[in-house]
């Protein structure tokens, strides 16, 4: 007959045993089925940048400033014509500009606006929010002045046309009156009555 186990021996036996942790997913049949159908996640093709690369990029940013990402345009935005398309009658297809718009040499408003906007696109200079806001405000002001000038030119053109129409109308009116007077004079002349004599 085997002797009785001491408490320390019992404790040592339970402690030495390796503990097994099994996930509930594998014990539950429904969860196990769902796990079998789950798609296997692939590793991303783009590798994560190393610390060295990150430091290098940060140094470049400190020296030269952040580079603006070039905008990529879709085919719809570029208005590229689609080939072999049926021509719909009566529908005008949008085309590009037919000619260049030249700016007058002494048109300072437009020239200043163009200089400011072109510089904005091509210069990769980092500026404070206040400076940028100030520059954008200047561009907006120039655009506003340009619009006002265009409206003024439009109004002047319209006024000239109105004056021309009024002149034409007044000339036509005077002609009508003159013709009416002439007709009245002709009516006032007494008609010679015809006399018939019998022999």
UniProtKB/Swiss-Prot annotation:
Residues 145-167 have a biased composition (Basic and acidic residues). Keywords: Coiled coil, mRNA transport, Nucleus, Ribosome biogenesis, Transport. Transmembrane segments: none annotated. Its main location: nucleus. InterPro entries: Loc1 (IPR037650). It comes from the Eukaryota. Component of the 66S pre-ribosomal particle. Belongs to the LOC1 family. PANTHER family: 60S RIBOSOMAL SUBUNIT ASSEMBLY/EXPORT PROTEIN LOC1, 60S RIBOSOMAL SUBUNIT ASSEMBLY_EXPORT PROTEIN LOC1. This is 60S ribosomal subunit assembly/export protein LOC1. It comes from Eremothecium gossypii (strain ATCC 10895 / CBS 109.51 / FGSC 9923 / NRRL Y-1056). The gene is LOC1.
């Amino acid at each position: 007959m085997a002797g009785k186990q001491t408490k320390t021996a019992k404790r040592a036996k339970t402690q030495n045993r390796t503990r097994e942790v099994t996930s509930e997913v594998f014990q539950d049949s429904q969860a196990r089925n769902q796990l079998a159908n789950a798609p296997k996640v692939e590793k991303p093709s783009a590798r994560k940048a190393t610390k060295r690369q990150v430091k290098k990029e940060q140094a470049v940013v400190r020296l030269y400033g952040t580079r603006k990402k070039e905008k990529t345009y879709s085919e719809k935005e570029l208005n590229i014509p689609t080939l072999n398309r049926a021509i719909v009658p009566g529908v005008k297809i949008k085309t590009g500009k037919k000619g260049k718009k030249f700016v007058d040499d002494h048109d300072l408003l437009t020239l200043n606006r163009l200089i400011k906007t072109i510089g904005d696109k091509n210069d990769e200079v980092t500026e404070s929010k206040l400076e940028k806001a100030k520059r954008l405000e200047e561009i907006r002001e120039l655009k506003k002045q340009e619009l006002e000038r265009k409206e003024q030119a439009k109004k002047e053109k319209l006024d000239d046309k109105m004056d021309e129409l009024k002149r034409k109308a007044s000339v036509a009116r005077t002609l009508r009156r003159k013709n009416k007077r002439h007709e009245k004079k002709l009516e006032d002349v007494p008609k010679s009555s015809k006399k018939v004599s019998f022999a």
